[in-house]
């Protein structure tokens, strides 16, 4: 898990655009963050299973 200091650091505006990085707003994870929802794949999956993301349902084909 990310430290609270890293979460606070990420909220500040980066001086250069290349220094900016995405971080999950719920758990602080850096990898596999969905930009549209601003959460990581793990949190996204949990919220989708709980039905907290409108219009999202498990794919079946």
Swiss-Prot record:
GO terms for cellular component: cytoplasm; small ribosomal subunit. One of its GO terms (biological process) is translation. Zn(2+) binds at residues 24, 27, 40, 43. Binds 1 zinc ion per subunit. The keyword RNA-binding applies. HAMAP family: Ribosomal_uS14_2_B. Binds 16S rRNA, required for the assembly of 30S particles and may also be responsible for determining the conformation of the 16S rRNA at the A site. This is Small ribosomal subunit protein uS14. It comes from Mycoplasmopsis agalactiae (strain NCTC 10123 / CIP 59.7 / PG2) (Mycoplasma agalactiae). The gene is rpsZ.
């Amino acid at each position: 898990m990310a430290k609270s200091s890293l979460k606070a650091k990420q909220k500040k505006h980066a001086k250069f655009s290349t220094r900016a990085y995405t971080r999950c707003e719920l758990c602080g994870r850096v990898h596999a963050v969905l930009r549209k929802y601003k959460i990581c794949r793990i949190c996204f999956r949990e919220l989708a299973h709980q039905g907290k993301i409108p219009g999202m349902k498990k794919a079946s084909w």
